[in-house]
Curated annotation (Swiss-Prot):
Transmembrane segments: none annotated. The gene is SEPTIN8. Residues 1-22, 379-442 are annotated as: Disordered. It is found in: Cytoplasm; Cytoplasm, Cytoskeleton; Synapse; Cell projection, Axon. Keywords: Acetylation, Cell projection, Coiled coil, Cytoplasm, Cytoplasmic vesicle, Cytoskeleton, GTP-binding, Membrane, Nucleotide-binding, Phosphoprotein, Synapse. This is Septin-8. Residues 186-189 are annotated as: G4 motif. It comes from Bos taurus (Bovine). Belongs to the TRAFAC class TrmE-Era-EngA-EngB-Septin-like GTPase superfamily. Septin GTPase family.
C-alpha cells in the first residue's frame, strides 16, 4: 500500500455505530430547549426597502406588520442616495422581534443614476464588516450583539407594464450576491390584470437573461416545499398597501377606495399581498436569516480573510493552522517591509544624487552669472574712468579759458580806468591856460 493511502486511511474518521437505548435518557427535549432559549433571546430581522420615492415603501411596511411606523416624509430633491435605518421592538404573543427597516431615501431621484446603487452596496458591506469585527474580537459577545446584517431586500418595481428600467437591472445585479432579493411590483392596482400578468413574465425573463439571482423560496424542507414551489411561480409579487379600513359587506377590511370600486389588500384575487406576507414572515423568515449568515455573510467573510492572507489549505489540500498562517503572513509582511525599505533607501539615494546634480548646476549657473556681472562691472568701471578723465580734461580746459578771460577782463578794466584820469588832467591844463589869458588881457 502506498504511503499516501496509509496517510489517507489513518486520517479517515471511523464510521459512527448506531446503538439502541435501554430506556429514556432525556435528550429528546433538545428542540424544546432550543425553542425556549430562542424565545428568551428574541429575534432580529432586518429589511431593506429599495425603490423610487413615493412608490409606497412605508405604506407597505405599515401594512405588513399591521402597525404604523413613525417615518419622515422623503423629498424628491435628494442630492444622493442615503440609507435611513429605523429599529422597532415588536411583540406577538410571547415572541419578541427587533425589526430594522432600512429605507433607501432618494433612490432614482438623481439625473445621473450611474452610481445610485453604490451607497446601498456600501451599507450592506458595512454591516457585514461590523459583524466580522465582532467575531474577530478576543472577547466577543455575539449573544448581546445587535445583528444589523440585511436579511432581505424588497425591491419595489414601478408598475410601467412594459419592462424593467436599466437602473433596476444594474442595482439588482450589484446586490444579488450580497442580499436576498425579493422583487415586488408596487401599486399593482394601477394596471390591469392582463397587463400585470404579461409584466410579470417580462420581468422574470429580463432577470434571467441578465443573470440576476433573486431569492427562491426553499423547497428542500418537506413541510413547506409544496407551498414554496407554488409561490416561486408567482414571483414577482404584485402588491397593494393601505392602512385605511373600508367597510365591505358587514366587516371592515384594509383596502383602497376608488370611484370605480374597492381594492382589498388581503384579497388574493385583488393582489399578492397575502402571498408576500406569508412567504416573508410566516414561512421563510428564518430561512432568510440563515441564508444571510451561511451564504452572503460567509462569502464576504471568506473574501476578507483571503485578502488578509488566511486560507484553509495549500495547493496540495494540506490544511493550514492559524499559527502557520500567521507565520507565513509575518514572513511575507517582513519581506515586503524590507523591500519597501530598500526601495525607499534607493529612492532617497537617487533623490540625493539628483539634488546634488541640481545644486551643482545651480552653482555653475550662479558662477557664470557672477562672471558675467563681473565683466559688466569692469566694463562699466572702465567707461566711468574714461568719462572721469574726459571730465577732468574738460574741467582743466575750462579753467584755462576762464583764467584767460579773467586776464582779458582785468586788462580791459585797467584800460578803462586810465582814460578818465587823462581827461581830468587835460581839463586842468586847459583851465590853467584860460586863467593866464584872463589876467594878462585888461
Amino acid at each position: 500500500m502506498a504511503a499516501t493511502d496509509l496517510e489517507r486511511f489513518s486520517n479517515a474518521e471511523p464510521e459512527p455505530r448506531s446503538l439502541s437505548l435501554g430506556g429514556h435518557v432525556g435528550f429528546d427535549s433538545l428542540p424544546d430547549q432550543l425553542v425556549s432559549k430562542s424565545v428568551t433571546q428574541g429575534f432580529s430581522f432586518n429589511i431593506l426597502c429599495v425603490g423610487e420615492t413615493g412608490i409606497g415603501k412605508s405604506t407597505l411596511m405599515n401594512t405588513l406588520f399591521n402597525t404604523t411606523f413613525e417615518t419622515e416624509e422623503a423629498s424628491h430633491h435628494e442630492e444622493c442616495v442615503r440609507l435611513r435605518p429605523q429599529t422597532y421592538d415588536l411583540q406577538e404573543s410571547n415572541v419578541q422581534l427587533k425589526l430594522t427597516i432600512v429605507d433607501a431615501v432618494g433612490f432614482g431621484d438623481q439625473i445621473n443614476k450611474d452610481e445610485s446603487y453604490r451607497p446601498i452596496v456600501d451599507y450592506i458591506d458595512a454591516q457585514f464588516e461590523n459583524y466580522l469585527q465582532e467575531e474577530l474580537k478576543i472577547r466577543r459577545s455575539l449573544f448581546d450583539y445587535h445583528d444589523t446584517r440585511i436579511h432581505v431586500c424588497l425591491y419595489f418595481i414601478t408598475p410601467t407594464g412594459h419592462s424593467l428600467k436599466s437602473l433596476d437591472l444594474v442595482t439588482m445585479k450589484k446586490l444579488d450576491s450580497k442580499v436576498n432579493i425579493i422583487p415586488i411590483i408596487a401599486k399593482a392596482d394601477t394596471i390591469s390584470k392582463s397587463e400585470l400578468h404579461k409584466f410579470k413574465i417580462k420581468i422574470m425573463g429580463e432577470l434571467v437573461s441578465n443573470g440576476v439571482q433573486i431569492y427562491q423560496f426553499p423547497t428542500d424542507d418537506e413541510a413547506v416545499a409544496e407551498i414554496n414551489a407554488v409561490m416561486n411561480a408567482h414571483l414577482p409579487f404584485a402588491v397593494v398597501g393601505s392602512t385605511e379600513e373600508v367597510k365591505v359587506g358587514n366587516k371592515l377590511v384594509r383596502a383602497r377606495q376608488y370611484p370605480w370600486g374597492v381594492v382589498q389588500v388581503e384579497n388574493e384575487n385583488h393582489c399578492d399581498f397575502v402571498k408576500l406576507r406569508e412567504m416573508l414572515i410566516r414561512v421563510n423568515m428564518e430561512d432568510l436569516r440563515e441564508q444571510t449568515h451561511s451564504r452572503h455573510y460567509e462569502l464576504y467573510r471568506r473574501c476578507k480573510l483571503e485578502e488578509m492572507g488566511f486560507q484553509d489549505s495549500d495547493g496540495d489540500s494540506q490544511p493550514f493552522s492559524l499559527q502557520e498562517t500567521y507565520e507565513a503572513k509575518r514572513k511575507e509582511f517582513l519581506s515586503e517591509l524590507q523591500r519597501k525599505e530598500e526601495e525607499m533607501r534607493q529612492m532617497f539615494v537617487n533623490k540625493v544624487k539628483e539634488t546634488e546634480l541640481e545644486l551643482k548646476e545651480k552653482e555653475r549657473e550662479l558662477h557664470e552669472k557672477f562672471e558675467h556681472l563681473k565683466r559688466l562691472h569692469q566694463e562699466e568701471k572702465r567707461k566711468v574712468e574714461e568719462k572721469r578723465r574726459e571730465l577732468e580734461e574738460e574741467t582743466n580746459a575750462f579753467n584755462r579759458r576762464k583764467a584767460a578771460v579773467e586776464a582779458l577782463q582785468s586788462q580791459a578794466l585797467h584800460a578803462t580806468s586810465q582814460q578818465p584820469l587823462r581827461k581830468d588832467k587835460d581839463k586842468k591844463k586847459a583851465s590853467g591856460w584860460s586863467s593866464i589869458y584872463s589876467v594878462t588881457i585888461p
